[in-house]
From Swiss-Prot:
Family indicated by similarity: Belongs to the uracil-DNA glycosylase (UDG) superfamily. UNG family.
Organism (species): Corynebacterium glutamicum (strain ATCC 13032 / DSM 20300 / JCM 1318 / BCRC 11384 / CCUG 27702 / LMG 3730 / NBRC 12168 / NCIMB 10025 / NRRL B-2784 / 534)
GO terms (BP aspect): base-excision repair, AP site formation via deaminated base removal
Function: Excises uracil residues from the DNA which can arise as a result of misincorporation of dUMP residues by DNA polymerase or due to deamination of cytosine.
Protein name stated in the entry: Uracil-DNA glycosylase
Higher taxonomy: Bacteria, Bacillati, Actinomycetota, Actinomycetes, Mycobacteriales
Single GO molecular function: uracil DNA N-glycosylase activity
Enzyme class: hydrolase
Active-site residues, as the UniProt record annotates them: D72 (proton acceptor)
Amino acid sequence: MEKLLMTNTLWNSVDELPIHDSWKPVLKPVEDAIRKLGVFLAEEEFLPPVDDVFRAFSYPFDAVKVLIMGQDPYPTPGHAMGLSFSTQPDVRPLPRSLNNIFKELVSDVGSLGDSASEQGALDLGINAPGSVAGTQVALPADGDLRAWSNQGVALFNRVLTVHPGQAGSHKGKGWEAVTEQAIKALAERDQPLVAILWGKQAQEVQKFLGDTPCICSVHPSPLSASRGFFGSKPFSRANEILSSLGATEIDWSL
């Protein structure tokens, strides 16, 4: 029976995955786990769309220099697109956690000093903070974070799928082994890496990161953001660490 079921899978091998070639040998040790997840998902309604599940692995393995960990995809249909915290460009209003990330982004390395930025805040449903002198990043135009990924920011979720409307529903289904393998491989390279870990679930992966510098705070959720996320300056701190390691800083503007 198991062999029969295994033929009905979304992914038979790592080589079939829509990922960058440099990730394929990294994920080869968890190929069986990925195949079994494909069996589970073949009979399950899930988000994000199947072609986006492995989007975080579509960027070069060797280019990663910042890791931002999420928990699982947004459970609202149309929001999740395979990168932690990121949304499709047309999503309005923003998910509340991303709303708070953008508030901290602007407070840390950005400014809302002009009327266009103020209007953008209203369009996105963000309560715009005051201007911050001497900073460079304007309010993002939307919730699409691919510009970060293009610079080497790995936007990983611990669990890569979710049942629509049921946050956390695919926890314990096998994704943890896959992302553990990926995180360990990133940490074991002889290359600069900084991890940004928001919330207890994200901080559970710290044990896989060896001596990788980690920037930790509470989660940007509205339930916790005021208890240490706001004011934590993760973006400027990450750049300071990258600079100290001889790596190019991230341009956090979107």
